[in-house]
Design a protein with these regions (language model features):
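The canonical Cys-X-X-Cys-His
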Residues: 41-51, 121
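Positively charged n-region of N-terminal signal peptides that target proteins for export
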Residues: 1-4
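Electrostatic cytochrome c docking/interface patches
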Residues: 21-42
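Bacterial N-terminal signal peptides
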Residues: 9-22
Length: 129
């Protein structure tokens, strides 16, 4: 009886292991990267808003916790002024889903359909004290 002894280099063993597990790794989706709230704000909001100055829409610094319709120097719609809304993450989320549905008669019409994008924008705004 003849026995054969196979000797493999460490590099060959590492390569074989990597190839053996490659299909397992390929089947796993990488976790999604966190969305960049600042970039989404710039893309979706900055045409009409800024953090520190009123534009077409009111400034946003300090929006979380503020009552709607109170930024000095901005001409709010009567509907938004009378709404009594306090901007929380929850009310901002509802607002961004459809401002006119939340406050009929408001000036704002732009929506953010994607819930993850809304959450990222709201998270960004919450940090802008």
């Amino acid at each position: 009886m003849i026995r054969t002894l196979l000797v493999f280099s460490p590099a060959a063993v590492s390569l074989a292991a990597a190839l053996a597990f490659a299909p397992v790794q390929a089947g796993r989706a990488a976790p999604p990267a966190p969305l960049d709230g600042a970039a989404l704000y710039a893309k979706n909001c900055a045409r009409c808003h800024s953090l520190d100055a009123n534009k077409i829409g009111p400034k946003h610094r300090g929006v979380v916790g503020r009552r709607a319709g109170l930024v000095p120097g901005y001409a709010y719609s009567p509907a938004l002024k009378a709404s009594g809304i306090v901007w929380t993450p929850q009310t901002l989320d509802r607002w961004l889903q459809g401002p006119s549905a939340m406050v009929p008669g408001t000036k704002m019409f732009f929506k953010v359909a994607d819930p993850a994008q809304r959450a990222a924008i709201i998270g960004y705004l919450a940090k802008q004290k």
